[in-house]
């Protein structure tokens, strides 16, 4: 497959990130490596989306702290960024709502075609008639006529500037879209782009708990978007999927990362990190990056047993 025919992917991880661990970052890296090795995908961005404060989980520190820790954890990454949208809403958002938000946002700011995990979308590029060739208006007539796929997620404002940082410098122009006044953006091309939910096997297993997830949401998450699962503690993902009719129905939409099942980061968790901090355990340096540890100590987080 050539670069232009591969499916382009953004990995989205939702969660408490209380705090964000080295395991979370490794989850992104392992998923990207695995998808690239299949020869069918190009991962062009990763998004960390911390949950809203009203989620109500015991010991959950404020989103202000969690967003800062997440930003510190990814500050050296050239493809993973932190998105505050979920935290900035008036109340807790479902995972399905977060996925739909980012899908709609990508449609607006990139103009590319987003599709379901199995069925390519026939939806026209936003702001363009279905039967007409898109005619962007250029401020600079010398823009390259064949942009690479990576350029679609170029700088469209500071809030999205880190979605895809692995891209060559290109000239910019003004794209006029009747549906979105976005100002200066990169030229786009029609490629297939999918947003996939990235999670551990513990979240996958939660789909099997009766009443925990709205079934309509599960249909959208697994059926329309798709999931990339990075197993933890050598979890049996086949057994997990067999316990849910929806997971069985859409098993082809669930990609399980099959690399080293004994990966050292697969046993790292936020819970272990909090306990290590509370007990002064030196192993915390194995769980959290140093900038995150420094921020936690400075802000006196997770010091008592209540979180």
Curated annotation (Swiss-Prot):
One of its GO terms (molecular function) is nicotinate-nucleotide adenylyltransferase activity. It is found in: Golgi apparatus membrane; Cytoplasmic vesicle membrane; Cytoplasm; Cell projection, Axon. The keyword Translocase does not apply. Gene3D superfamilies: HUPs (3.40.50.620). Pathway: Cofactor biosynthesis; NAD(+) biosynthesis; NAD(+) from nicotinamide D-ribonucleotide: step 1/1; Cofactor biosynthesis; NAD(+) biosynthesis; deamido-NAD(+) from nicotinate D-ribonucleotide: step 1/1. ATP binds at residues 24, 271-274. GO terms for biological process: NAD biosynthetic process; negative regulation of cytoplasmic translation; neuron projection maintenance. Its main location: Golgi. Its EC number is 2.7.7.1, 2.7.7.18. The keyword NAD applies. Keywords: ATP-binding, Cell projection, Cytoplasm, Cytoplasmic vesicle, Golgi apparatus, Lipoprotein, Membrane, NAD, Nucleotide-binding, Nucleotidyltransferase, Palmitate, Pyridine nucleotide biosynthesis, Transferase, Ubl conjugation. GO terms for cellular component: axon; cytoplasmic vesicle membrane; cytosol; Golgi membrane; late endosome; synapse; trans-Golgi network. A lipid is attached at residues 164-165 (S-palmitoyl cysteine). NAD(+) binds at residues 16-17, 92, 95, 200, 202, 212-213, 232. Monomer. This is Nicotinamide/nicotinic acid mononucleotide adenylyltransferase 2. It comes from Pongo abelii. The lineage of its organism: Eukaryota, Metazoa, Chordata, Craniata, Vertebrata. The gene is NMNAT2.
